[in-house]
Swiss-Prot record:
PANTHER family cross-referenced by the UniProt entry: CHLOROPLAST PROTEIN-TRANSPORTING ATPASE (PTHR30612:SF0), SECA INNER MEMBRANE COMPONENT OF SEC PROTEIN SECRETION SYSTEM (PTHR30612)
Role description: Part of the Sec protein translocase complex. Interacts with the SecYEG preprotein conducting channel. Has a central role in coupling the hydrolysis of ATP to the transfer of proteins into and across the cell membrane, serving as an ATP-driven molecular motor driving the stepwise translocation of polypeptide chains across the membrane.
Disulfide bonds: none
UniProt-listed Gene3D superfamilies: Helical scaffold and wing domains of SecA (1.10.3060.10), P-loop containing nucleotide triphosphate hydrolases (3.40.50.300), SecA, preprotein cross-linking domain (3.90.1440.10)
Record's protein name: Protein translocase subunit SecA
GO cellular component, one term: plasma membrane
Organism: Deinococcus deserti (strain DSM 17065 / CIP 109153 / LMG 22923 / VCD115)
Binding of ATP, residues: Q85, G103, E104, G105, K106, T107, D508
């Protein structure tokens, strides 16, 4: 095992050394020369010409480009890229996942790869997990890009279409992962070129995904869906929510314990599934007065009852979702603890939860467009990722995305001390110990950050801390509006912060607090200008440096007063003094209140302490009542506590326990990886179909009139061939052909052929019959062109193709949803569900294409042009 670990370490070290030799050293050698260049934008434009006109590759110009970008950072925003940041920039350019510790400056690192790849003129995207980080990143780095002559934009949810178009037309665009994915889907539903948000050419060229593990692994199972209301009654969910209260939860069958399951249903917490027993089926059939719950006409009932039980037993308020002020069920992201407005559980589960909570049930939605992040980001010509924790998931990044992970060295040595876990028998014993440790730390003035896995836990601990007289702040899905402000000050002395799943929070915790953040907020609140306005930015930086010029720079801001400047200077002085005090006390102390299913989430929490060489420490408190331990850990550890006669207040601190926890986490990670891989296998079937439809649709939307006309004629010819294959197959004698059926099908679609002599097709070979019929239909198309004029016909064809494709694709997605939901039952019939799914999905797609061609033919020949508008 150690050999394998050493090999991994050696490979990483070898790659780092190679980048130092080929990138870092040459860039450093150019630094003095680059500092003499007056016009950095002109020099960068010259590199752009070399790439776009001179045939040089991005690798050819990487060294001079990085030198210019570093100098632009130094001049414009006062930040010079460290050598380790150059390593990170090179890794991102290579399309790798760069693992960088918290506080190592990922935002600045990204400017290297983004600016370099922008030289191609095809657009680059910096993808973040929320709007706040996208806006801050764009505004913080905007001046650097503009110094190089590059344009930078922000694409956000509330923008008008023309604003989005301008943002995506920039060299570099900052955008959230969800908005980017939805823009892609919306563009593939657009009815005109003018309605496109993203670039018409090269919309997905290069992207850097921040918090890449959160987006591409944690959110991989959640597809992006654009939906419309489907006409379906929802009141039955209330009926079934009441009905299942009359059912009894039982225990599953277990070898050596019970041969048969008990009760009316059993639950599988690990797989988040429920199983209705034979007794339960009989009871439900009796309550509903139906003979067979699983007969075809009752499948909807069986599905809704199953979802009602899942909603009752497996999805819990304040942990999996919250109810907002408007009575809406809002999902909580299990990995980040963030609320996700607009997201809904699929397959009727969301409606079942709404019925359980007795709030208004929203109409079931019909999918209009959908894609998973797994398949979306693989559409890019090249993409890279940044995160503080990726190495543990390298196998998944390699298997699914073809991206390896490079661990970037830290600029300063990490001083954080990570203690062994303390394991308690019960949750209450654990919480009491946490409160005691917080009290001890708080008494010294040392800041403490407590990480919890749910809102329920954060509120329980908050109550306990309040009872102990310890002032604190709470950060969870209910208080996201104050998120950045709370996190920014979590490093001040005496501060105690409870945070639900710190993963992806995106704001650095600075020891002593973040004076720049507070000052920026004050400027926006009291002076009414953005903290990123040049005059405000210069003032904030001068205050941060305790520069005597701060007073002069401050007075250039409209509305500024001497009193405000004095308060800002005092704030900075207090922050500097507090930072020194906190460092002396040992830095930020992290307390984890339970181990997460993923080691990455635990590592992200630990990583909040010890940034940029600061001191810090961490410890996790675990109990055998925690979900991870209860479901996955080894029973031997519990037995050992029993033998030792340990009470609730006595912890174990042993490597055996830590090992058991890590094995449990590894098992869960493997299971989740298998689930995501299986999801990808199923989604790949849909992905190929989506790629085909979207590519054809894009050709219709953006192609010249002659191409649209050619596509239309091709579809009409295919329709004719299809009818011939059905009614007059070439391997049959013409005497056996169903000429009446052929005539009915063709004339229904092409009424202009009503006078055509179909019976005469029997005289001659099948090929001659095909030629005659295709020629007659082509003549009808020419007549249609003469009737409407070429311009009008092409407008009609474009409109018809888009409308028909969209309608059939929507219906196909619904059919695929139904197929996917029911395919698991095939396993009971000894058939492989995936093979069955792939076979049936392909047949459904081919049938859709045939129906699509049929409808296009009918609309082209029957529709009046005036009806299109």
């Amino acid at each position: 095992m150690f050999r394998v670990l050493n090999k991994v370490f050696d490979n990483n070290q070898r790659d780092v050394q190679r980048i130092i030799k080929t990138v870092v050293d040459p860039v450093n050698a150019l630094e003095q020369e680059t500092m003499q260049i007056e016009d950095l934008a002109a020099a960068f434009l010259d590199l752009r010409r070399r790439v776009q006109e001179g045939g040089e590759s991005l690798d050819d110009v990487l060294v001079p480009a990085f030198a210019l970008i570093r100098e632009a950072g130094r001049r414009s925003i006062g930040k010079r890229h460290y050598d380790v940041q150059l390593i990170g920039g090179a890794a991102l350019h290579q399309g790798r996942i760069a693992e960088m510790r918290t506080g190592e400056g990922k935002t600045l690192v990204a400017t290297l790869a983004l600016s370099l790849n922008a030289l191609e003129g095809r657009g680059c995207h910096l993808v973040t997990v929320n709007d706040y980080l996208a806006r801050v990143g764009m505004e913080e780095m905007g001046l650097l890009y503009r110094t190089l002559g590059l344009t930078v934009g922000l694409a956000s949810r509330e923008m008008q279409p023309h604003e989005k178009q301008a943002a995506y037309a920039c060299d570099i665009t900052y955008v959230t992962n969800s908005e980017l994915g939805f823009d892609y889907l919306r563009d593939n539903m657009a009815q005109s070129r003018e309605a496109l948000a993203m670039r018409a050419e090269h919309p997905l060229n290069y992207a850097i995904v921040d918090e890449v593990d959160s987006i591409l692994i944690d959110e991989a199972r959640t597809p992006l869906i654009i939906s419309g209301a489907a006409e379906k009654a929802t009141d039955l969910y209330y009926v079934y929510a009441k009905l299942i209260r009359r059912l009894q939860k039982g225990e599953p069958a277990e070898p050596g314990v019970r041969a048969e399951p008990t009760g009316d249903y059993t639950i599988d917490e690990k797989g988040k599934q429920v199983h209705i027993t034979e007794a339960g089926i009989s009871k439900i059939e009796r309550l509903l007065s139906i003979p067979d719950l699983y007969s075809p006409e009752n499948m909807d009932k069986a599905h809704m009852i199953t979802q009602a039980i899942r909603a009752k037993e497996l999805y819990h308020r304040e942990k999996d979702y919250i109810i907002n002020a408007d009575g809406e069920v809002i999902i909580i992201d299990e990995f980040t603890g963030r609320s996700m407005p607009g997201r809904r559980y699929g397959e009727g589960l969301h409606q079942a939860i709404e019925a359980k909570e007795n709030v208004k049930i929203e109409n079931e939605n019909q999918t209009l467009a959908t894609i998973t992040y797994q398949n979306f980001f693989r559409l890019y010509n090249k993409f890279a990722g940044m995160t503080g924790t990726a190495k543990t998931e390298e196998k998944e990044f390699l298997d699914i995305y073809g991206s390896d992970v490079l661990v970037i060295p830290t600029n300063r040595t990490i001083l954080r001390k990570d203690s062994e876990d303390l394991v308690y028998r019960t949750k209450m014993g654990k919480y009491a110990a946490v409160v005691q440790e917080v009290a001890e730390m708080h008494a010294t003035g040392r800041p403490v950050l407590i990480g919890t896995a749910s809102i329920v836990t954060s509120e329980q601990l908050s109550d306990l801390l309040t009872q102990a007289g310890i002032r604190h702040s709470v950060l969870n899905a209910k208080f996201e509006a104050q998120e950045a402000s709370i996190v920014a000050q979590a490093g001040r002395s005496g501060t105690v912060t409870i945070a639900t799943n710190m993963a992806g929070r995106g704001t650095d915790i600075m020891l002593g607090g973040n004076a720049e953040f507070i000052l920026g907020e004050s400027i926006e609140q009291h002076l009414g200008i953005s903290r990123f306005a040049p005059e405000a930015e210069n003032f904030i930086k001068a205050i941060s440096r305790q520069d005597p010029a701060a007073e002069m720079l401050g007075m250039q801001i409209p509305g500024m007063t001497p009193e405000f400047i004095q308060q800002a200077q005092q704030l900075q002085a207090d922050t500097v003094a507090d930072r020194a005090r906190v460092q002396e006390l040992g830095g930020l102390h992290i307390i984890g209140t339970e181990r997460h299913e993923s080691r990455r989430i635990d590592n992200q929490l630990r990583g909040r302490a010890g940034r940029q060489g600061d001191p810090g420490s961490s410890r996790f408190y675990v109990s055998f009542e925690d979900d991870l331990m209860r479901l996955f850990a080894n029973d031997r550890v519990v037995a050992m506590m029993d033998r030792l006669g340990m009470d609730d207040s006595q912890p174990i601190e042993a490597k055996m326990v830590t090992g058991a926890i890590e094995k449990a986490q590894a098992r869960v990670e493997d299971r989740n990886f298998s689930t995501r891989k299986q999801l990808l296998e199923f989604d790949n079937v849909m992905s190929k179909q989506r790629d085909t439809i979207y590519a054809q649709r894009r050709e219709v939307l953006l192609g010249p009139d002659e191409d649209v006309e050619e596509s239309t004629e091709g579809m009409i010819a295919d329709f004719v061939d299809m009818q011939l294959a059905i009614h007059a197959p070439a391997d049959q004698s013409p005497d056996a052909w169903d000429i009446e059926g052929l005539q009915a099908a063709i004339v229904d679609a092409v009424p202009q052929l009503e006078g055509f002599d179909f019976e005469s097709l029997r005289h001659g070979s099948p090929a001659q019959a095909q030629d005659r019929l295709l020629s007659a239909v082509a003549d009808a198309f020419d007549s249609r062109r003469e009737e409407l004029g070429s311009t009008m016909l092409n407008s009609l064809a474009r409109y018809v193709l888009l409308q028909v494709v969209d309608q059939h694709w929507k219906e196909h997605l619904h059919g695929m949803d139904v197929l996917r939901q029911g395919i698991g039952l095939r396993g009971y019939g000894q058939r492989d569900p995936f093979t069955e799914y792939k076979f049936e999905a392909t047949n459904m797609f081919n049938e859709m294409i045939d129906n699509l061609k049929s409808d296009v033919t009918k609309f082209i020949f029957r529709m009046q042009f005036g009806q299109t508008g």
